[in-house]
Amino acid sequence: QNNFLNEERFVKSFVRGRFNQKKWGRNKIKMALKQRQIPEQLIRIGFVEIDEDEYLKVLKELFVKKQEELKSETNSFKKKLKLRNYLLQKGFENELIFDLMR
């Protein structure tokens, strides 16, 4: 029981920190926690720490920032590919990225 509570506290703190400081998406956070052998149910509990509106706001901010960096890229296909890959690498879900890029 006590160990579970300590792990839960760790997971919540980890999720908050990685999202707020490093701007990681759920997929990247989940992979990092799985590498630490954290159970799936604890990971789901940890994701409660991420506000959905804030999550989408961060995704849009990263999208706009990367778009600015890629201004000089003339090939629109390459630009979209680089944008998508960047956001996937940050751990955001493919569906959300796809919706944002439409």
Segments (PLM) and residue ranges:
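An alpha-helical, amphipathic repeat domain used for nucleic-acid recognition
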Residues: Q1-R102
